[in-house]
């Protein structure tokens, strides 16, 4: 499963309402960390967001090291990902999201994201590309 950058932000001590990694470690979601994959562009996006928020560079570097060790990180510059991301860019304004979604499409893996535009287009994406789009709440185990 490809995870969006949002879920990596807590590793750089950036608070989010949807801490997928913590929930996974605690067994509260239906996906294990070992099943999660990250686009390399998410590392850059995390770094940029952390810089904007004034997070110390040492914390960011540590987060990037953890991501590289804990996850399968997929390059964003493969021919297929570039082609699909350019195609998606015609209807999606955020190129980071295009690349992350393109990574899921090219690998044939499901995507978990909180992005409202992707969720608005979820039915079309799922039908056209035969992947599933989830958000954090949909991965929570039923109690």
Where are the language model's segments positioned?
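Short, conserved catalytic or adaptor-binding loops enriched in Gly and charged residues
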Residues: 26-31, 64-68, 124-127
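Acidic, PIN/NYN-like endoribonuclease modules and their adjacent C-terminal/linker elements
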Residues: 70, 74, 105-106, 110-143
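Alpha-helix capping/helix-boundary segments
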Residues: 7-8, 42, 80-81, 99-100, ...
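Short, well-structured N-terminal submotif of metal-dependent ribonuclease cores
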Residues: 1-38, 50-62, 140-142
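Acidic catalytic patch
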Residues: 68-90
């Amino acid at each position: 499963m490809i995870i969006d950058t949002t879920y990596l932000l807590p590793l750089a001590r950036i608070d989010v309402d949807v801490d997928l990694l913590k929930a996974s470690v605690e067994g509260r979601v239906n996906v294990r960390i070992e099943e999660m994959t990250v686009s390399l562009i998410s590392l850059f996006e995390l770094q940029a967001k952390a810089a904007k928020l004034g997070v110390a560079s040492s914390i960011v570097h540590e987060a990037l090291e953890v991501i590289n060790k804990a996850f399968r990180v997929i390059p964003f510059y493969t021919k297929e990902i570039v082609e699909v991301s350019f195609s998606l860019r015609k209807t999606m304004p955020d190129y980071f999201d295009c690349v992350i979604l393109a990574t899921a499409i090219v690998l044939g893996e499901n995507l978990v994201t909180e992005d409202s535009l992707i969720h608005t287009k979820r039915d079309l994406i799922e039908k056209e590309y035969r992947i599933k789009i989830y958000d954090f709440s949909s991965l929570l185990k039923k109690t």
